[in-house]
Amino acid sequence: MSFDIAKYPTLALVDSTQELRLLPKESLPKLCDELRRYLLDSVSRSSGHFASGLGTVELTVALHYVYNTPFDQLIWDVGHQAYPHKILTGRRDKIGTIRQKGGLHPFPWRGESEYDVLSVGHSSTSISAGIGIAVAAEKEGKDRHTVCVIGDGAITAGMAFEAMNHAGDIRPDMLVILNDNEMSISENVGALNNHLAQLLSGKLYSSLREGGKKVFSGVPPIKELLKRTEEHIKGMVVPGTLFEELGFNYIGPVDGHDVMGLISTLKNMRDLKGPQFLHIMTKKGRGYEPAEKDPITFHAVPKFDPSSGCLPKSSGGLPGYSKIFGDWLCETAAKDSKLMAITPAMREGSGMVEFSRKFPDRYFDVAIAEQHAVTFAAGLAIGGYKPVVAIYSTFLQRAYDQVIHDVAIQKLPVMFAIDRAGIVGADGQTHQGAFDLSYLRCIPDMVIMTPSDENECRQMLFTGYHYNDGPTAVRYPRGNAQGVALTPLEKLPIGKGLVKRHGEKLAILNFGTLMPEAAKVAEALNATLVDMRFVKPLDDTLILEMAAQHDALVTLEENAIMGGAGSGVNEVLMAHRKPVPVLNIGLPDLFIPQGTQEEARAELGLDAAGIEAKIKAWQA
């Protein structure tokens, strides 16, 4: 997509923040309007995160107008809302390539631009990093400002509060901006409150406050009276008591779509000392009515026609694995009142919408709090219930200690339904489910299952749910199922694989949903094909049998080779002193960038042609 100068005349003048700061302030509302329209035009053509960026247009313009970026450090939490930031920082003409192979990264990325101070993708990291950056700048004597932008969802995470508690203790010079888009702009976000925010952040008020503290520091009763009076005045109009108690100077809430007001407030706050907190109210999806009405649906979008106001409907093909899980969850809950389902803010992505509606008293969205989700599940299990934690592979990493300390050590029957395992695609390095087999396999008493299709996935969910001797995990990929027939639910024998095809000389031991590719390769090479099913416990007997009957073995998994299922097979063979050649095929020792799942698998040699080529090259 080429940039249309005639359609966006003001935006055409801005390809860097230096050019932005040359614009007269009066032209900024027009710039915001053009930026929002350009974002709509670009993302609707290319796909990507959508509604969040529409809500941060004015904030982005104001921040880059007031602060001397990239010298001043601007940190975006998660990064869904950072598309306008990318457009204004030299990437305007490439925004149509975002999330595509070889294109712009889906999130702020240090290797992409000097304006991207922190590489992100996961939630609630900005304030912790911001404190470190601010402290480093202070120790180096660099007169630079540090600003962190965090959303109302991300700030609920414990890590954000841990960081704010630390900031209140060491008091670095930094600004945290809470982008609150949970609701429409409330009544107290109007002219009076904006004026008050500018007054409270202004030099006169700050000087009076600090001067008063110094003058009356030796008169404790008067000093305490001043403090109480200040808190009373601010408390009448602002909900910032919590942040004040953490040691921040709280300002807000203010209208996050008033670019001129934001500039005034940011200028006032820019040189204040100590940790500052600005609370802005925005509308997710701002400027595009369908996204304003349904920001969840329009959070991330495929290519669509903006004039229709609708996203394209699915082709009605095969269900995704998330739906397979969601259907099983509802089916099981209808039969067992002990089932409790937990998600850390991923209801839609994990296929739990229907469950949340049918069984609201047994559905728990704990917000972005993976650590709490796991230990909460442990508590439910102790109380006699059957918790199922639905979580993405990449997010389960954040609760690793809880899996070990609070669940596995106590042998609690918590089941982890691990979605987005393996290659995820367009969200790139931060979201690939590359490590779960490696980091779970070493935990004692953990049962780990890798289904090869949707029917096996259901059977494994059923098996894991009814296993009472410790935690279980079923990992399944992003994307559609394979269309196999669904059979009645029954428990699988723990730790037992299944030979799918008998061949000669070579045996392929497959773990998971690469089975269709493995079947093609086995046919082409006349190899034996085994559906291993369990990563832990491994079917040692079957592995040794395959080693005795074949000249070589190949293990196949969509997980990091290091420490993965293939490593487990190697350990079994070495423990039994079986010197059989083994080729481990899986994800290499690198962070896999964005692109479609098909593109990534082809590049990594994990499609049928690539797997066959790897085996032939190894055998040569």
UniProtKB/Swiss-Prot annotation:
| Binding-site residues, Mg(2+) | 152, 181
Q: How is the cofactor bound?
A: Binds 1 Mg(2+) ion per subunit. Binds 1 thiamine pyrophosphate per subunit.
According to its UniProt entry, one GO biological process term is: thiamine biosynthetic process
Q: Which cofactor does it need?
A: Mg(2+); thiamine diphosphate
Name the top EC class: transferase
Pfam families on file: DXP_synthase_N, Transket_pyr, Transketolase_C
Q: Which Gene3D superfamilies match?
A: 3.40.50.920, 3.40.50.970
Supply one GO molecular-function term: 1-deoxy-D-xylulose-5-phosphate synthase activity
Which reaction(s) are listed as its catalytic activity? D-glyceraldehyde 3-phosphate + pyruvate + H(+) = 1-deoxy-D-xylulose 5-phosphate + CO2
Task: Give me the Gene Ontology terms describing cellular component.
Answer: cytosol
Give the binding site residues for thiamine diphosphate. Answer: 80, 121-123, 153-154, 181, 288, 370
Report whether Transferase shows up as a keyword of the record: yes
Which superkingdom is the protein from? Answer: Bacteria
Q: Which family does it belong to?
A: Belongs to the transketolase family. DXPS subfamily.
Q: What does this protein do?
A: Catalyzes the acyloin condensation reaction between C atoms 2 and 3 of pyruvate and glyceraldehyde 3-phosphate to yield 1-deoxy-D-xylulose-5-phosphate (DXP).
The protein's name: 1-deoxy-D-xylulose-5-phosphate synthase
